[in-house]
Structures are given as structure tokens and as C-alpha cells.
Design a protein with these regions (language model features):
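Conserved alpha/beta-hydrolase "acid-adjacent" motif
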Residues: 238-246
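C-terminal catalytic histidine-bearing segment of alpha/beta-hydrolase fold enzymes
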Residues: 232, 246-249, 253-293
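Short beta-strand/loop motif that positions the catalytic acidic residue
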Residues: 225, 230-233
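N-terminal cap/lid segment of alpha/beta-hydrolase-fold proteins
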Residues: 23-64
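Mobile cap/lid helix-loop segments that gate and shape the active-site cleft of serine hydrolases
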Residues: 41, 188-221
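Primarily recognizes the serine-hydrolase "nucleophile elbow" in alpha/beta-hydrolase
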Residues: 126-192
Length: 293
């Protein structure tokens, strides 16, 4: 399949059932704060199922007074599916390696669209900056990470200062972005072409307005001075993902950034996130260097 099909949740659930079954067998030197609201329940758009996050913290006190580095992880699912509870293994693995992990839910399409999803992610980031010290994290060392559609949303957090300013962050706090087979980096070009059968499904989250497609495509927000990016691309992923990621990297290079760009041979799209169950892989190795863990 060549088209851009982004991690339907049913397929992922089948793939991770063994991982979840063994989660409690694996040593987990971490603490988990579950279902923490990141939007006030008095807010008119508060969603008790989607405006929540989990925080995974190392059990040991941070070696630095400021606290552990922080990674905010955003799940994928074609912008229409997905749940933080599938990704407990990522939170556990990061905490085991000296990182405070924040794994979030956000509202899905329909009924909302990508701008509302990006706003939810920005609100989760604002909550993280304000509260992460309570969980042993350093608010001055916050990084974002996402897989599939979550990668595109994470890239928006790293590039769209105006979005963050709307949600209480006048200065962008993101210190780096980890892209795990990201989708949605250039939906403007993708939706203009409509090359593959079924591409109209992406009009559900992105709507019919090309101006909105461009506004929600982080590739058009690249400029000098952005935080560092690192990329991990499956050698057998969808051409749209490898293509847009390569163009994103090239635009970053034109600004003077030299983003590490790792192609993992033989990896399809879903295994690019499933491999994070195992602690010893190249994604964690490079991530830990980036965040200074």
C-alpha cells in the first residue's frame, strides 16, 4: 500500500496486546500520575476523556536541582483515533532512563478539526511548563515527540509561536522535537494532489479550505532559530511520510540546522512506534543525547 494510511487504532491495539500483557512483568522504576486534566473543568469546551494526560516520573530524585528533562509525547491515529493508554510503555521506558514523560490525549476528528487538536496540544504543553516541577521535571528542558499524526502536531508546537502565545506561552518553551515517522508535515501539498484512493478521508480532520491545510502544515513555518529536530523514518514507511520528512529536513538545513535523519531499514509505519517498547534502540539513544538525560 503506497498511500498515506495513518495508524488506525484497531490495528495498533492488535499489535500491542502482547506488550500490554507483559507491562507488569517488566521492572518499572517509575511513578505514574494518571488522567490528570490539563484544561480546567470549568472551560466551556472541557472534555473529560480527551483533555487529560499521564505523567511518568523516575522514582529516584533528580541528580540536578532543576529536575529531569521532560518529553511530551503525542500519539498518532489519522487525527481521528488513538489514546494515551496505548502508550504506557513509552512513558515507562522514558522514566526508566531518567526522563519525565508526559503522554497526552487530545480531542479527535470529528467533531473537531486539526486547529482544535493543535490547540489542545498547546494547552497540554502550557500545563507541562506550569506543573512539571511538581513531578520532578525541569520546565526549562521540555521536548516534544510524536509518531504519525502526532509527529505533525509535535512539529506545530515546535514551529508555531503564535499558536503557543494564544495559550499562555509568550515564549516557545520547546527545546527540541523528536519526529518518529511523522505525518502531516505538509498536508497542503498532499491534499492538493489527492494522489491515492481514499485520500478524501483526511478532509474530515483538515476540512476543505486549502488555506487551513497550509496553516496546519508545519513545513511552512520553518525559519532560522527553531529548536533542534531529529528524525527517525521507517525504511518501508509510506512514501508520503518519507517524502515530506525529507523536504522538512531540507528546509531546516537551509536555515543552518543540521537535523539528524535516521532511516531504519525494513521498518514499516506501525513498527516505528512499537519498537519503543524495547529500551535499547537507536531512537532512545539519540533522544537521550538530545535531552541531556
Amino acid at each position: 500500500m503506497r498511500r498515506f494510511l495513518l495508524l488506525p487504532v484497531a490495528g495498533l491495539l492488535a499489535a500491542v496486546v502482547l506488550l500490554l500483557a507483559t507491562e507488569y512483568v517488566v521492572a518499572r522504576p517509575s511513578r505514574r500520575a494518571k488522567d490528570v486534566p490539563y484544561v480546567a473543568n470549568s472551560a466551556p469546551d472541557f472534555d473529560k476523556e480527551r483533555h487529560i494526560l499521564d505523567v511518568y516520573s523516575p522514582k529516584k530524585a533528580a541528580p540536578r536541582t532543576a529536575g529531569y528533562p521532560v518529553v511530551l509525547f503525542i500519539h498518532g491515529g489519522s487525527w481521528t483515533s488513538g489514546n494515551k493508554n496505548i502508550y504506557t510503555f513509552i512513558g515507562r521506558r522514558l522514566a526508566k532512563q531518567g526522563v519525565v514523560a508526559v503522554v497526552i490525549n487530545y480531542r479527535l476528528a470529528p467533531p473537531v478539526h486539526v486547529p482544535e487538536q493543535a490547540a489542545d496540544c498547546a494547552r497540554a504543553l502550557a500545563w507541562t511548563v506550569q506543573h512539571i516541577k511538581e513531578y520532578g521535571g525541569d520546565p526549562a528542558r521540555v521536548f516534544v515527540m510524536g509518531h504519525s499524526a502526532g509527529g505533525g502536531l509535535a512539529a506545530l508546537l515546535a514551529t508555531d509561536d503564535a499558536l503557543l502565545a494564544q495559550h499562555g506561552l509568550p515564549q516557545n518553551p520547546v527545546r527540541g522535537a523528536i519526529m518518529d515517522d511523522p505525518a502531516g508535515l505538509d498536508m497542503y501539498s498532499y491534499l492538493k494532489e489527492m494522489k491515492y484512493e481514499g485520500d478524501q478521508q483526511y478532509l474530515v480532520p483538515f476540512g476543505n479550505d486549502p488555506a487551513l491545510w497550509k496553516a496546519q502544515s508545519p513545513i511552512y513555518k520553518i525559519r532560522p532559530g527553531l529548536p533542534p529536530f531529529i528524525f527517525f523514518i521507517g525504511g518501508e514507511t509510506y512514501p508520503s511520510i518519507s517524502g515530506s520528512s525529507g523536504r522538512f529536513r531540507d528546509r531546516l538545513k537551509a536555515t543552518g540546522q543540521a537535523p539528524p535523519y535516521t532511516i531504519i531499514p525494513g521498518r514499516h509505519h506501525i513498527p516505528m512506534v512499537l519498537q519503543l517498547y524495547w529500551q535499547h534502540n537507536i531512537i532512545y539513544q539519540q533522544l537521550l543525547k538530545l535531552v541531556g538525560a
